Structures are given as C-alpha cells and as structure tokens.
C-alpha cells in the first residue's frame, strides 16, 4: 500500500467515523429522527400516514353534528396534514429510540404540534417579525435555543396563545401514534409488566430495528472527507477516468453529474481543453507556508482575531449586575446582553469549525508537498474537490498555500508583478498597475521589511489589509526578495481577478465598445471600475428623482452609504439573470449585516425594492445592450421549451454543455420551528422539461460556460508555452 492509497483509505474511514459520531450524537441527544436513515424512514412512510390522518379527520367531521373527539378538533385547526404527519413521525422515532412509554411519546408529539400551532399564529399575526426571527436563528440547530428565542420574541411583541392542556396533548399524541401503527407499521406498542406495574412502550418493530442497525453501520451512506493528495492525482483521460488513486474514491468524476448518458455524450465530443485544464491544475504541486501557519496557530491559541480567523473561544457569560435580584432594569439589561451573546456564539460556531479544519489540515500536510484533485460542473467551471482547504478558499486558506516549485525573479518586470500582488491584497486592486507598482516600491517595501522582521509584533498593521493573511504571506516573500536581490526564487502565488466577468462576456457578445472599456477589455492604461460608475449613476438618479419621489428622497439623504462595496453584489447579479426581487434581497442583506444606520427599517421591502430598480436602471443606462442580449437568450430558451427540449451547446473550448431541468411532483414539508425538512418526490422519472426554470437559468448558465471556456483555453495555452 502506497502513502497515497493509505491516505485515501483514511479519507473514507474519517467520513465513516464522522457519520458514526453524528449518529451517536443524535442518539445521545434523543434526536435520532435527524439522522439520514431516519429521513429515509419518514419519506417511505409519510404518504400512507398522511392519507390515514386525512381519513380520520374526514370521518370525524362527516355526518350529523355532535361532540367531536378532542384529537379531531385539535388536528382540524392545522391547514396542512403533511406537517402533522411529519412532526408525529419525528416524535415517534425519537420516542422509540429513547425507549419512552407511549404516554411520554404522545405528550412529546402533542407538545411539538402545540409549538407548530403557536408559531403559525405568530407568523400569521406578524409575518415580517416572524421571518426576521427565523432567519436570525437559521444558523443553529440547537432546538431549545431556537424555541426559547421564538417564545421570547412572542412575549416581547405581546402575543397571546392559549396553551394546550396536558390532557389534550396526550389525546392528540396517542391518536396519532395509533394511526401511525395501523397505517405505516414501523412501530408498535409493547406492554411490559414489572411487579404490580404495567407500562406500555413505543418500540420499533423487529423488521424496522434490524434495518436501522444495518443503516447505522452502512459504510456506503458515508461521505469521505476529501483532502489533498501526497502523490500527483491521476490525469483525467475521460470524464470517469482520473483523479483519486483508489477505487472507493473513483466515484468522483471529471464532471459533477450523476447522468451517465451525459458523461458518455461529453466524452464523445472529446473535450481536450477541459482535460488539459483539469490536469494542469492537478499537476500543480503545492506546499504549506509554515511561517504563516505558525503565526495563525499562535493567533488562534492566544485568542487574537485577524480577518477570517476568529477567536477560538465562544463569548463568556455576561457578568451579572450586583443588583440583578432587586433591580428590574439591571435584570432586563443582563438578559438582553445574554441574548446577544448567545446569538453571536451561534453565528460563530461554523466559522470556528472552519478555522479548526484549516489549521488542522495545514498542519497535517506541513512537511511534504501536496496536490489537489479537480472537477468541473456541467457548465465547465472548475473547482477543487478538497473542501474548504484549497487555493479557492478564504483568505487564510489561500495564504497557507504556496507553490512547491518556485520561479526565480530575475528582472524588474517580474519584481513588479510580485509587487502588484502585494498591492492587491493590501486593498489597491482597483488602482492602475502603475500606481500599484509605485506603491510596492515605496509604502509596500517599507511595510514588507517592517512586518517580516517580527510579524506577531505588527499584527495591528498587517491585519488592516483587505486580505490580511495573504498580505502577510506577501510581506514575508517580498522581504526575502529585497534581502536576496534578483535570482531569489519566489513561491508566492500572484492572483489576478477578472473585472466583472459577466459584463465582459456581454460586452463581447454585443460588441459594446463603451461597456468593453468599463470592464477593462480595452487596452487602456487607466483601470476602469464599472461598480464605481454604477454607484455614481445610482446617486445621480436618486438626486434627480428626490424632488418628486419620497423613496428617492429617503435614499438620497443616505447616499453616502451607497458605496462601491454596497453596490458590487447587486450589479454582479444582473448578467447572471438576477431579478429585481433578488437584487432587493442583496441590498437588504448588506444593510442588515452592516452597522450602517438608516432612518427606516432595514427590512423595508419598499425601500430595498426601489433601490434595486434604480440599480437596474443605472446599469441599463450604462449598457443598454445587456438587456437586449439577455432577452435574446431568454427567447432562445423559450423556443426550446415550446418543443419540450433541453438546451445544449458547445463552448469555445469545445466543451459540451447540457442544461437539464425536469418537472417532477415534489412537496417540501417545512415546520415553523424545526430545522429539518423533507422532500417527497412522487414522479421522479418524468422527462418533461421544466420550461420556466430552463428559461430563467439559461442566460446565467450560458455566461458561466463562457467563463469556464476562458479558463480552459487560458490553461491550455499556458501549458503549451511551458
């Protein structure tokens, strides 16, 4: 067994171990219903369970008036029987898993349904506030915290809900368990006598229990934790041959698609440029920048936050005021601070996990060179397989990567390009090349010498960079060049970002000279900035309209907040078929996540939608041909839809793209509080084209495919030139 095959075996084993930890964690918390195999059980039994509940309700409410069963009265108040069935299924699975009595399981089901009804009422009475709260708690799966937050906001808003009695919860729960046993048969009631006492438990049937035991140990259900390779990946020679070395990881294809027919079609077209691009990236040998790793680990250990590296420890409990027991104001203040603390810790949990994964993976590969496996999506865009630790990752992930085989800097031209890399990571990417080169010779050189002399003493300086960790890596490398002079072998990657690629492609497709200049397709010395131009146009529009429209007046009063940073994402969305609603959501998300103060609610749809329309209008004023091209692409998609055909095309790199969106009957069941959902696919084998989705997606996918073709051809040319 080679070192690489051993590594791939461990990737697989770690994926299995992770799944086992998740299962054991759910079992210990009493939430086995959140496991992958439990979701399979729910999907299998939900439809007959829904039908049985509906039949019970129909019988109860059919015929002569009279006293209805408590369960029927309570369940009749729910609009969606699917939700009743889903919640019951989860409660019963958790009850059987924990060996609860029928009474305990029934009360749990009743309690969960009561919460569903309570929060449905909250949504009906104040949908805007409910939506904000649910979005706020969306990044944590801690059920008690989610419920407490929702309950707290209901109390603060003065909502009153008549709680179910314990008797009502029990009757509803027992009836639903009875229906589930009759209609689905995965569970049963088992009576156990102990002395003079008799208890009835909810249990899985023997067939179900045997199946669960097999699923808990099912290695095929686990997802490997993909990592870099210590041996060069196998070159791609077809869409199914290449990448990892061992068979158990060879399910990773050159193109991320489960459609084997599509793989065959692509292979027949012989996409040589795609294979060359994938292999060129896979053949790139990397090594860990151990100096950056040591500093990052030191910051992590000492609790110093820099850029995307956050504090290793969650925020501690807020100290209680000395008069908390006697002073209501102090008590309220402390509770508010604790809510904010819990919120921040919940938001930081995933970021903290990513930091740990980055540092651990970098430490693991710190002593030898490594490679990354690559694959493409159906539009041809290329990605690294290995999770968050790759050269496309965040600032820290990129800074930890450097070339294992460097290149000597032998003249001023090469030195200038390295200087431009430093200026970019410092935050000068929109300045001209001449300005960036001049900066590197003056301020950049001084910063590199100072920071490299003692990086940890000057954290307060390099942490101010736009990309602090990459800037630190640059300072270390540039200082070596200054110390050693020409002939120094640099391993620092020089990253060059495209200037709004989407609009570049629209400029090329429409032969729009004006737009081409604004996205730097013209050979001008001065760097243009489309985002800055759109920002200026938006402010101009708001000023002109502020005399006659209240919303324009509101926004113009805050025009200093309409910055390049704020405008960037909404503008980027437009060439990829971004609609007004989506652009308005991007505006909302920006201001909600910022500390900027507005004189209206940041969630105000009217204000956000209005600014989105102004942004669209401004882009159209700058480049009216963009709308023409998008409409033309939409017309093409509609023609295919009328003939019930998928759209396919060949990109300039000879890559075959096939857009496949089919109609199928699917229902997604969502609850008001709980994080899990389930999709029910009733007719998954239909081949009827989803005309609406095909039309909406075509322009974006077409532009993405041109982006990808550019990468394929550029890497092919680079490979050919050595």
Give each language-model segment a name:
Residues 1-571, 575-708, 713, 717-721:
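Non-catalytic nucleic-acid-binding interfaces of large nucleic-acid enzymes and RNP effectors
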């Amino acid at each position: 067994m080679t070192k690489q095959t051993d590594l791939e075996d461990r990737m697989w084993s770690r994926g299995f171990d992770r799944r086992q930890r998740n299962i054991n964690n759910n079992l210990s918390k009493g939430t086995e219903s959140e496991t992958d195999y439990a979701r399979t059980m729910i999907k299998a039994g939900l439809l007959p369970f829904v039908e049985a509940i509906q039949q019970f309700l129909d019988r109860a409410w059919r015929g002569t008036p009279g006293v209805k069963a408590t369960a029927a009265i309570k369940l009749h108040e729910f609009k969606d029987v699917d939700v009743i069935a889903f919640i019951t299924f989860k409660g019963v699975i958790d009850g059987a898993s924990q060996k609860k009595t029928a009474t305990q399981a029934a009360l749990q089901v009743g309690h969960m349904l009561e919460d569903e009804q309570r929060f449905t009422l909250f949504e009906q009475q104040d949908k805007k506030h409910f939506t904000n709260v649910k979005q706020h708690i969306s990044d944590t799966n801690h059920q008690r915290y989610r419920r407490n937050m929702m309950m707290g906001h209901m109390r603060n808003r003065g909502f009153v809900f008549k709680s179910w009695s314990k008797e009502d919860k029990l009757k509803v729960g027992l009836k639903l368990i009875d229906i589930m046993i009759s209609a689905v048969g995965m569970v049963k009631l088992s009576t156990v006598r102990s002395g003079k006492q008799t208890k009835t438990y909810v249990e899985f049937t023997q067939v179900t229990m045997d199946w669960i035991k097999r699923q808990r140990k099912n290695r095929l259900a686990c997802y490997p934790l993909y990592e870099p390779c210590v041996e060069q990946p196998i070159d791609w020679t077809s869409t199914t041959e290449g990448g990892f070395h061992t068979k158990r990881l060879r399910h990773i294809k050159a193109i991320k698609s489960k459609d084997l027919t599509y793989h065959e079609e692509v292979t027949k077209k012989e996409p040589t440029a795609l294979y060359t691009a994938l292999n060129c990236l896979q053949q790139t040998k990397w090594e860990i920048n151990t100096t950056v790793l040591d500093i990052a680990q030191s910051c992590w250990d000492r609790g110093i936050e820099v850029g995307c590296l956050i504090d290793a420890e969650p925020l501690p409990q807020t100290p209680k005021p000395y008069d908390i027991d006697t002073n209501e104001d102090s008590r309220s203040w402390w509770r508010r601070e604790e809510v904010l603390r819990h919120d921040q810790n919940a938001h930081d949990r995933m970021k903290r996990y990513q930091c740990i994964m980055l540092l651990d993976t970098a430490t693991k590969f710190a002593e030898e060179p490594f490679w990354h496996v690559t694959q493409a999506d159906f539009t041809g865009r290329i990605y690294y397989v290995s999770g968050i630790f790759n050269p496309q990752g965040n600032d820290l992930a990129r800074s930890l990567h450097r070339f294992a085989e460097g290149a000597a800097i032998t003249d001023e031209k090469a030195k200038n390009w390295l200087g431009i890399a430093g200026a970019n990571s410092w935050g000068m990417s929109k300045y001209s090349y001449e300005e960036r080169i001049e900066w590197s010779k003056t301020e950049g050189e001084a910063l590199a010498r100072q920071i490299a002399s003692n990086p940890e003493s000057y954290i307060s300086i390099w942490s101010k960079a736009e990309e602090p960790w990459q800037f630190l890596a640059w300072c270390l490398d540039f200082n070596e060049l200054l110390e050693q002079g020409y002939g120094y072998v640099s391993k620092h990657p020089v990253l060059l970002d495209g200037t709004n690629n989407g609009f570049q492609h629209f400029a090329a497709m429409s032969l729009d000279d004006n737009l081409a200049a604004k996205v730097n397709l013209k050979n001008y010395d001065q760097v243009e900035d489309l985002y800055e131009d759109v920002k200026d146009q938006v402010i101009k529009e708001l000023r002109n309209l502020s005399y006659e429209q209240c919303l324009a007046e509101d926004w113009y009063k805050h025009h200093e907040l309409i910055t390049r940073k704020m405008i960037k994402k909404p503008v980027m969305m437009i060439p990829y078929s971004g609609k007004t609603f989506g652009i308005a959501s991007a505006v909302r998300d920006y201001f909600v996540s910022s500390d900027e103060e507005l004189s209206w609610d940041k969630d105000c749809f009217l204000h956000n939608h209005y600014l989105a329309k102004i942004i669209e209008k401004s882009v159209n004023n700058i480049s009216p041909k963009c709308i023409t091209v998008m409409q033309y692409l939409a017309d093409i998609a509609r023609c295919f839809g009328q003939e019930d055909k998928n759209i396919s095309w060949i990109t300039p790199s000879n890559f075959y793209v096939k857009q496949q969106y089919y109609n199928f009957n699917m229902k997604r069941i969502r609850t008001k509080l709980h994080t899990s959902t389930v999709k029910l696919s009733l007719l998954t084998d239909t081949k009827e084209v989803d005309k609406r989705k095909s039309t909406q997606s075509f322009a974006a996918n077409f532009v993405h495919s041109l982006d990808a073709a550019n990468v394929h051809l550029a890497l092919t040319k680079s490979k050919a030139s050595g």
